[in-house]
Every structure is written in C-alpha cells, then in structure tokens.
Amino acid sequence: MKHSASESKPLSSGLAIYRRLLRYGFPYWRSFCVAVVAMIAYAAITPFFAKLIQPLIDGSFIDNDPTVLRQVSLMLIGLSVLRGIAGFLSEYCSGSVGRRVIADLRRDIFDQLLNLPCSFYDNASGGQLLSKLLYNTEQVSASLQQGIITCIREGFTVIGLMALMVYQNPVLSLVFLVLGPVLGLSVRFVSKRFRRLSMRIQESMGKVSHVTQEVIDAQRIVKVFNGKDYEAAKFATENDRNQKRQMKLIATDALGGGVIHLISVAGVAGILYVVSLDSVRQTITPGSLMAFIAAMAMMLSPIRRLSQVVSVMQRGIAAGDSIFAMLDLPRERDRGRISLKRARGSIEYRHVSLVYDDRHGAAVDDVSLVIPAGKTVALVGQSGSGKTSLVRLLPRLYEATAGEILIDGHDIRELTLESLRRQIAYVGQEVTLFNDTVASNIAYGCLDRVGLDAVREAARAANALDFIETLPQGFDTLVGQQGIVLSGGQRQRIAIARALLKNAPILILDEATSALDAESERYVQQALEVLMQNRTTLVIAHRLSTIQNADQICVMRGGRIIECGTHAQLMAARGGYADLYAMQFGYSSVPEAVAVHAVRR
C-alpha cells in the first residue's frame, strides 16, 4: 500500500491525526480525568523528594538538629505512599482507556471491512488489512496510553523540578534553560524520522502477514508443488526488510535519546562549573546546592523518557494515518428507499455496461436482457466473455457503469441493499464455508430466525442429510476452515441447503457442478433441480450438458450477448452456441454436431 502522500504531510497533519485518535478516548473521559489528575499528583510529589535534601543537610548535619532527620524520614514514607497510589491510578486508568480505544478502533475497522465495496478487495492485500486490525491498533493504543502518561506525568515532573530549581537559585537555572531550544530542535528532527520509518514498518508488517496468510491458505498447493523453498525465500525477504527497518528505528531512538541525554548532562556540567565560581558558591548553602543538583539529576530521567516517547507517538500517528485512510474510504452506496418484502422474480437488464478499469475495455457492454419470473436463463461463453460480471451486477456487488437493472420493475438502486440481497441466493463453484458447525453454515444469515427442524429439512432437500448424520457430531460437527473436513460434493450440498433455507425468489448458480465427480454431480444436480423450482434462476455454465433444459440460453462474447434462444433454436441457428457445442462434445464441425443433435432428438 502506498504511503508516499502521508509521508510528505506537514507536522500539523500529525497533530490532526492525534486529535482524531484522542476523540476515541472521549467516551471514557471519567477514567481519563482520574488518570490525568493522578499523573499531575505524581509529578507534583516528585520535586518534594529533591526539596527534602535541603533540610536534611542544613538541619541535620549543619545545625545538628536530630528532629529534622526524623521529620524527613516520615515525610519520605508519606510521599512515597502518595506517589505509589498516584502511579497506580495513572497506569490503571490510562490502560483502561487504551484497551477500550483498541476495542473501538477494531470494531470500526471490522465494520468498515464489512461495508466496503467488492472493488476495494480486488486490489487489497488480506495481510495488510489484518495488520491494520491487529498491529496498527496496538501501536495507536501504545501511542495514546504511553504518550499521554509520559507527556503529562513526565512533563509536569520536569516543570515541577524546574520550578524548584528556579526557586532554589534563579541564576543557575538560566544555564539549564539555555539548552531548551537545542533540545526542541533535536526532538523535532527525531520525530520526523520516526514517522517515516514507522509508516514503512507498518507496510512491511502487512507484507509479512500477507505472505504468511497465503502460505496458510494454500498449504496443500505449496506442498504438492514443492514450493516450500520459494515461499521461505519470499518470507525471508519481507521479514529481513522489516527487521532492517526496525533496526533503523531502534538506531534513531538510541541516537536521539543519547544526544538529548548528552545535551542534558552538558547543562548539568555547565551548572556545576558555575557553582565552582567563588562569587556563586558564597550565595548558596550546602543543602540548597544539593537540592538543586538533586533536582537536576532527577530531571534527566523524565527528559530522556520524554525524548523516547516521540518514537511511540510517531508510530501511533503513522498507524492512525493508515487506519483512518481506510476508514475514510467510501462504503457501498445504499441510498435506496424501497424495501422489497418478496419479489416475484422478474429481472430486466437495460443497456447495462460495466467497466472495472478505464485502462481496459468494458467487461459488460450494452447488454439488454429480460428474464420472466420463475424462468431459468443460462449464460454461456468462453472465459472472460462477461458472464460472471453480468451476474455480479444483480446483487450490486459492483455498480453498473451505464444502464439500469430492474427487479419487478424496480431499479435495484432504488431498493435498500438489505432488501435487494434478501431476494437472491447464490451457489458457486468455490463454496465458502466458515469454521463453524454444519448447522450454522446452513443457517448462515438467518441463524436467529430458524430452528434445527428447518435446517434438517433444507439438508434433506439438498441430499445432504445422509452424510451429515454420519459425521461425528452430526449438525454440530465443526467443518474446519473452508469446510476442509468435507468433500467437494458435500460442501456443495451444504451450500445448496443454505440457499434452500434462505428461500429467495432469485437464484444464481455459478458453475455449481463443474468441479465434481460423476457421483457427486448426480447428487448435487438432483438437489439443484429441487432448489430451482419456482425460482428465477441465472445459471453460469461452461458444461453445456447441464443447461440444455434452460428456458433461455444466452451466449456472451466480449461483454455482449450475441444470441439467445432455447437449446434447439440455437443449435438450428448454427451460431456461437453451436460452435461451443461442437467444440465441447468433440465434433469436427458445426454441421456434424447439428446433424447428430437432430438425430438424437
């Protein structure tokens, strides 16, 4: 995925992204406020530890007052308890906000994935999307949680210690304050580099996830084709690229932290040099000097943590930029106002065209077709002729570039997506099953509306009940990812049972029997005949033997319908359909195929 645009954005865009991330924490403002108050309390208590050094030295050792030592001891215990409580509250409450933000972000990302159009997934990487959902959200949480804790708690600690230093000796404090602009420039440089590197790391993490997911999904192909070495090399390349980018980030973090620490130590050294001057040394007591030096020493650690939090915050901003870029993508258009309860099933395509990409020609080119309710229409043609593209337009998986499609006289764009898709059932060549029970897969989409009796009846009608009852847990058997524990024919019958249970008036069959053996095809074909009864059916077929009884057969070529008719009419016409028939059944010529066909009739 490309990030060049985001990498060149000004710093203000990073602030805008961070503000948008912070809005995810607004619903949990009570916990956030408790965390902020606890952080400020923690920071306010810290300077008192340095301040106590002055009475400890001046009172106990200079003035020889033992009561001061006892008082300081009690105060140290009290301050430690208070700071411990404040530290716990700040960590717990900010952690609570951070985890809730992650949950909300993941919910929004998943909801967006469910509502993005199919065209988005045509060019999207599954690994990249998974990386956004898992890795990027963790980066955002770390940015919010650690970033806020460090900025508020350590920031106020530095302010408190600096105030103590100014109170103890304003002149010496000026030496330390002079280094402020130098620290600011260092942090600015480091933050810009962190953001660039973080974006590249997130991109490479997505590629690592993508390669891994591909190997898991295609592990049988990898084994059969001895692709282990190739896949290992591909993974090693992406993994090594990610590791190198991580090392650049670590180097930048270490170098930036070291430089900032060096600048801070230089300030301390400068102050010690100034204190060595007689004119200054005579104006300060030993206790006051030690309190001042203690405040400086205690300030170094918060300053270092503040410099290191830049990396966390920039990673979070880069992750947020990537997440929001996806969340801002347009969703499927659902502007229809008509909710169709149950269609009769008549379908009409009027001069419909579809262009996936302007660089290529039309996948569907000015197609007009009328399908009466309850009729079966088969679409045939060579691969790439536009059959599947034409059918994909019906449930609005893709939007037609031109023309209109009507169901029962209603333009499908005027129907709500939910009611449109409620009218359509689908059975394809590649059956999609979820890693759930057989019953849940059959009842998918209507789990809350049907009982087991309805599921059993659908399975019986789909010729699936016999094999389901032989499974270890029957309908409660887990089918595995993509139904891996079932055969191809069994998966197909589960898909048919799912379509039967949906009981939609329109049915799409996409090469539903092309990958089956003869026995499985017989069972599936019987189930399909039951499924097609009293339904408007669109059949995409390569095997012409399966669609000869269709009410109408349409031959497609180059995105257009070149001829339509019954099997007998098209054979008699000796056109494109007869060519396909002769080729598929091994006849030497169309006339021979037509002659044999006439004799068989």
UniProtKB/Swiss-Prot annotation:
ATP binds at residues 381-388. Its main location: membrane. The gene is msbA. It comes from the Bacteria. Residues 34-315 form the ABC transmembrane type-1 domain. This is ATP-dependent lipid A-core flippase. It catalyses: ATP + H2O + lipid A-core oligosaccharideSide 1 = ADP + phosphate + lipid A-core oligosaccharideSide 2. Involved in lipopolysaccharide (LPS) biosynthesis. Translocates lipid A-core from the inner to the outer leaflet of the inner membrane. Transmembrane domains (TMD) form a pore in the inner membrane and the ATP-binding domain (NBD) is responsible for energy generation. Disulfide bonds: none annotated. Belongs to the ABC transporter superfamily. Lipid exporter (TC 3.A.1.106) family.
